[in-house]
Amino acid sequence: MEHYIWLSMAFIFIGVYISKFLAHKTNTVDVLWFIIIGAVLGNFHLVKESHALEFLGDIGIILVMFALGFEEDAKAFVDGVKKAWGIALIGAIFPFIAGYYSAILFGFSQNSALIWGLTMTATAVSLTMMTLKSLNLHKTKAATGIMTSAVVDDVLSLIGVAILLPIILSGGDTGNLTINYTELSITFAKVIIFFVTVYLVGRFVLPHDNGLQKLFKLENGQYAVLGIFVIVFLFGAFAHLLGFHPAIGAYFAGLLLKEEYLQLGQDKFYNIKSVEDIIHNLAFVIFGPVFFILLGTKIIFDVNILGEVILPTIVLFLSVLIFQIISAGGAAKFTGGYSNKDSILIGLGMLGRAELAFIVINIAYVQNQLITQQEFYILVFTTFLLNISVPLLIKAYTPFYNKMKD
């Protein structure tokens, strides 16, 4: 049935066109329309699930994160990390609490409550950063705070998965609650190895840029993009090897690559501007949108079960939304020293739920049947609503942000 893959890709790219058009006509962000169009394509069975499509979506998000990292100022990022710990920690704990007690409120088991809480922790930074970019806010202090906090949040979420899933799988409701300290120690070791390696590469390897410039200047710079791809996928592979999403590695690849490495000269066939344009088009026009449209296709509406999940979904959505904005925004203000306007933007920017949410849902429902079909829809719909609220709320807040003083 290979023809379905090609047909699905055609519908996806048609969806990208429609999304871009609607975003322009309605003066809204295209990420919102990617998800909506994806939901339409999925419910009308115009895009079928495929490992090949998922792989293309993964490539898209990797390129998006690299492009965003490349546009980031490394020094600003390091300064931002110093402010990020409170935002990430507090901004992860409170959504977990909201998810946990929402499940308890509706009479679900402790296992379910842990799954609900864990699903609500990891932040979908790529969704937020694409939204900020479309509004020309991606180089603000708040954007740096969101990105750095989300990286730390991703680490905390991985640790949460390492701790809680073994507890749940070992029979949490029977009272046999045990923490696998071996797995937890391994996770901490991987975190340390990843960041130490990134630091060493950025501090001692890449500054000796002669080799990179020779690579990028081959054939008058025609292979510069290919050279970038090599570096991006090496970083992505290393991150994946240690249990991170490859997009995290790609972001750091972009962060560590400096523009001077691509100063190929105006007389060359390719210069830094043309290379940046190619990367931008691949990331934000071709492959990146594939990821977000596929994200939308995961929302399959079933009329029979919709009535049962409306109230729990609304309660979970509102509780996470309120807890996330207040906790992340408050932490940004009081632990990170951000201004009021940046703190609010950070609170809004931390709302989206990341791929880890769908991974947890998949493990809990598809692989281990730890949650019911009703819970599956509640978590998927809530994740969708949170993701779709990010561009809407940031778009609505942008005029106030631009008017407010630092």
Give the role of each language-model region.
Residues 22-26, 40-83, 208, 212-220, ...:
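Membrane-interface junctions of multi-pass transporters
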Residues 12-20, 35, 39, 43, ...:
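Transmembrane alpha-helical segments of multi-pass membrane transport proteins and ion-pumping complexes
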Residues 28, 70-82, 106-111, 131-144, ...:
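Juxtamembrane helix-boundary/capping and inter-helix hinge elements in multi-pass membrane proteins
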Residues 22, 86-138, 201-205, 295-401:
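Transmembrane alpha-helices that form the ion-translocation and gating core
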Residues 1-11, 51-66, 110-125, 186-197, ...:
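Structural signature of hydrophobic alpha-helical transmembrane segments
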Residues 160-180, 236-241, 298-308, 360-373:
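Transmembrane helix-loop junctions at the membrane interface of multipass transporters and ion channels
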Residues 32-44, 86-100, 148-164, 217-235, ...:
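Small-residue-rich segments of transmembrane alpha-helices in multi-pass membrane proteins
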Residues 25, 70, 164-224, 240-244, ...:
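Multi-pass alpha-helical transmembrane bundle typical of ion/small-solute transporters
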